[in-house]
Amino acid sequence: MKRIAIVGAGMAGLSALSALTKQGHVVTLFDKSRGSGGRMASKKVGDASWDMGAQFIRAHDASFMKTLHEWQHQGWVSEWAVTPHVIDAEGIRLSDDETTRYVGVSRMTALSRQLLAPATEFIPNTRIVSCQRTDSEWLLTDENDQHHGPFDSLIINTPPQQALPLLENSHLAAAINDVEMLPCWTLLLAFPERIDTPVDAAFVHDSAIAWLARNNSKPLRDSGETWVIQASHAWSQEQVDAPREEVLHALEQAFFTALGVQGYAVSEHWLHRWLYAVPAKPLDAGALFDADRAVAVCGDWCQRGTLEGAWLSGQQAASYF
């Protein structure tokens, strides 16, 4: 039995937690946010709520499909029976997409809370800023100069830019130094009435927007009319430091234009910038491991830029211990 620290409670970190606790290890998770889930984030403003990060889960890998079905049996996820539209210069039409999509119920963060349960300890609101390896143990220090540990092994589940300062004396730093992460501006809108459109989700082209979805079309969501609008990564990169009001206005207008509707009053809104949303080019390495220092690094950017990729990456990271 080992004492293992995981920095970052996103999907890959939760995946590693699942595997490690099944092996009997004692696992402590740290996260800079107040909760778990990373990009499985949800947001509530007034009476409105949204999944503001990852919109759904899908599976290509047989082992992950088995895991998804187990979660479904436990009531942690449910199928989102949606066929996305395509919106482009030719108009609005149904896509030929037949992918089965799943969502956490009653929000994406509900799944992360279930996956967090096996942790020996979860320490939120704690940003780890340095990790020191002695002869056989890890000691972690947070931004308030509080020390944590000792631990036998360490798993880092953060974007590569945030992992680098924690890997100063590991050869893994060179392996991830050039990994590029792309941003994504996300606008959340709520309306006092239902928008008259057959679209519940759509891939959008020729626009600042790449994806939009009627959040309340997902199973077991609040009934109020809520929409998630995700900008394209290229547009987000161009506008990465633009004033928030300008970004909000541009995405709101692009939303109405894409759906071909006007005259709907917005009752609530929220704008969020995901600075490290997805990898431009995943490493396709599964996870990275420094055996000499007993540290592994995982995340969707190590495998594939999806929740499935993050889960598989976490499983591989855990296998090293």
Per-segment meaning from a language model:
Residues 124-138:
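A conserved short coil-to-beta-strand element within the FAD-binding core of flavoproteins
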Residues 21-45:
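Glycine-rich FAD pyrophosphate-binding loop
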Residues 56-60, 92-114, 241-247:
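Short beta-strand to alpha-helix junction loop
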Residues 2-30, 318-321:
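N-terminal Rossmann-like FAD-binding beta1-loop-alpha1 element of flavoenzymes
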Residues 249, 256-293:
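Flavin (FAD/FMN) cofactor-binding core of flavoprotein oxidoreductases
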Residues 188-239, 246, 250-259:
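Active-site substrate-recognition segment that forms the wall
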Residues 42-85:
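N-terminal FAD cofactor-binding segment of flavoenzymes
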Residues 37, 46, 147-200, 261-264:
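Central helical "cap/lid" subdomain
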